[in-house]
Amino acid sequence: MLMPKKVKYRKQQRGRMRGKAWRGSELSFGDYGLKVMECGYITDRQIEASRIAMTRFIKRGGKIWLRLFPDKPITKKPAETRMGKGKGAPDHWVAVVRPGKVLFEMEGVSPEMAQEAMRLAANKLPLKTRFVMRHDVKTTVAAK
């Protein structure tokens, strides 16, 4: 699973998710991408499940980039524990995403194959997503 090698503080406060993503909202590496449309948390397991689903579908056809990393620890107290006695132990890691953030990018495959691979990945995620294409790829596909 994805997680930071070392962190300054083991536990973090929850924080608030407001506004849109102002970084990471454009395609940077590939020709196709999966953009999230609402804010929320994506766990390390969900990221890995999405990555495996895409990789299995395209086999060795193209290249995939992950544009998010789970860097926020989520704590959990043991079951049947009374309230109080401090914050729970770190349980898993999540990536905080806001609307407009590109989660995955892909290149080296046809648009139909990329869209299907992204659909399979989106089924593993808890948030609404949208398939996006680079502008110059759209014009090339339309010209054919």
Curated annotation (Swiss-Prot):
Alphabetically ordered keywords of this record: Ribonucleoprotein, Ribosomal protein, RNA-binding, rRNA-binding, tRNA-binding
InterPro entries to which the protein is assigned, alphabetical: Ribosomal_uL16, Ribosomal_uL16_bact-type, Ribosomal_uL16_CS, Ribosomal_uL16_dom, Ribosomal_uL16_sf
Keyword Amino-acid biosynthesis: no
GO cellular component: cytosolic large ribosomal subunit
GO molecular function: rRNA binding; structural constituent of ribosome; tRNA binding
Pfam families, A to Z: Ribosomal_L16
Superkingdom field: Bacteria
GO biological process annotation, one example: translation
PROSITE patterns assigned to the protein according to its UniProt record, in alphabetical order: RIBOSOMAL_L16_1, RIBOSOMAL_L16_2
Assembly information from the UniProt record: Part of the 50S ribosomal subunit.
Role according to the record: Binds 23S rRNA and is also seen to make contacts with the A and possibly P site tRNAs.
Family named by the database record: Belongs to the universal ribosomal protein uL16 family.
Protein name: Large ribosomal subunit protein uL16
Species name: Acidobacterium capsulatum (strain ATCC 51196 / DSM 11244 / BCRC 80197 / JCM 7670 / NBRC 15755 / NCIMB 13165 / 161)
